[in-house]
Design a protein with these regions (language model features):
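Active-site-adjacent structural elements that line small-molecule/cofactor binding pockets in enzymes
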Residues: 1-299
Length: 299
């Protein structure tokens, strides 16, 4: 398995600081930049940020981590991804999820009541057809197209990754996706998730490539988990010890990544749990530490 470790900007991903942060990542030779979907925030929107970052760099990959698919029309999403892949071949890393992380944003991605999972499944099926077929005719419960084409298809089909950690989400990865990016799971839990995904894939006679399993890992550089992140963990994982889900400094990050690799994961998105003043200059020491402490773990 090829271990690769990318970076999410965290609170440094605002328009005022984004360009400087992207330039620093490129200069430092970081593998990839990941952009979360947080509409009610000052963070750059993922597809906009990906286009900007890819146009400004020549090596850096860019991923959406994680964008909401249900509530978006898959034809429009396919057009965006095909355009990005045409402009920056081999550097586009789409990851999709079922719903936004913030409850307040769910109304922005409207789907029929009680049908979000079904819409997600159908959206993924249509999205993949549009990215691989010259002309697509599709009649589903939620989407219908006839002779649809986005006009350009990636020379190599894009790998579509999904997030999520619920059993149904993991089985969806096995049935419909090319990879998985989890979060807030212990190494043991992540290893079990890999097993669930591969079992679901086998049931439909497919396989997720062994090196297509990853995790988003927050790093608390001073060892203290910020209150906002702590509240989020307690909301999502009330039974879990937060210290098992957040790396305490770079030593903790190296140790945890090693444990995740032993559990069968090889792709990681590391983000700062907090930054002093939420600006790009404050992010630069994080990048320097990341390059010094974590990049040598790649192979």
């Amino acid at each position: 398995m090829k271990v690769r470790i990318g970076v999410s900007l965290g609170p440094a991903g605002t328009p005022e600081t984004f360009a400087d942060a992207v330039d620093r990542l490129e200069q430092a030779g970081v593998d990839s930049l990941w952009l979360p979907e947080m509409v009610y925030s000052s963070l750059v929107e993922p597809f906009t940020g990906m286009a900007f970052a890819l146009s400004r760099t020549s090596r850096l990959k860019a991923g959406s981590g994680i964008s909401v698919l249900p509530g978006r029309h898959p034809v429009l999403v396919a057009k965006q991804l095909a355009s990005l892949a045409g402009l920056a071949p081999g550097r586009v890393l789409p990851v999709f999820g079922l719903r936004p992380a913030q409850d307040a944003e769910r109304a922005l991605f409207a789907v029929p009541e009680g049908q979000r999972a079904a819409v997600f499944d159908e959206s993924l099926a249509l999205l993949r057809l549009l990215l691989t077929e010259e002309s697509v005719s599709f009649e589903g419960a939620f989407f219908s197209v006839s002779g649809a084409s986005v006009g350009m298809r990636p020379a190599r089909p894009l790998d579509i990754w999904l997030g999520g950690s619920a059993p149904a989400a993991l089985r969806r990865v096995g049935r419909l996706a090319d990879g998985w990016l989890g979060s807030l799971l212990t190494p043991a839990e992540a290893g079990m998730a890999v097993g669930v995904i591969q079992q679901a894939a086998g049931e439909v006679e497919r396989e997720v490539e062994p090196d297509h399993f990853g995790l988003s890992l927050p790093v608390a550089l001073d060892g203290d988990i910020p209150d906002a992140l702590l509240a989020s963990i307690r909301r999502r994982r009330p039974e879990a010890d937060p210290a098992t889900l957040v790396a305490a400094g770079w030593d903790g990050a190296r140790r945890m990544i090693g444990q995740y690799v032993e559990a069968g994961l090889s792709k990681f998105v590391v983000r700062p749990a907090a930054l002093p003043r939420f600006g790009a200059p404050d992010f630069f020491p994080f990048i320097d530490g990341f390059v010094r402490e974590l990049v040598p773990m790649q192979d």
